[in-house]
């Protein structure tokens, strides 16, 4: 006999909705030739001068993934690398004028995907959901814990 569940399967609910939201985001951004990672790099590089390493951390990307992402942005003429004025070893990701235009469009797309998901809920439920998720993300579930077998996780923020 299977054990009796005493709580809703929060892991499934969060994983499933997150996965579906990511697929919708990928499809929507794909229409303008971007990935979610490319969007993340463009938007955060426009906020302030940031190094490739800083942007990788914000986007939860390893070095290889970040290099591939920036290579794609360079190839598309949306961003470039330039030396840091304060650290010879670091590279600043500089967004081009075309990249800034694409970033504004991609942010509209991202906002639209989020708006569409939230619009499927009544106003009162939407506000409660967002407050609860924000409380979890900045409180009890803010940081992962060490584990002998690392949990695979999706890219964060961005």
Which residues does each PLM region occupy?
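Short alpha-helical transmembrane interface motifs in multi-pass membrane proteins
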Residues: 7-11, 99
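A conserved beta-turn-beta hairpin within the catalytic core of GNAT-like acetyltransferases
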Residues: 16, 51, 87-89
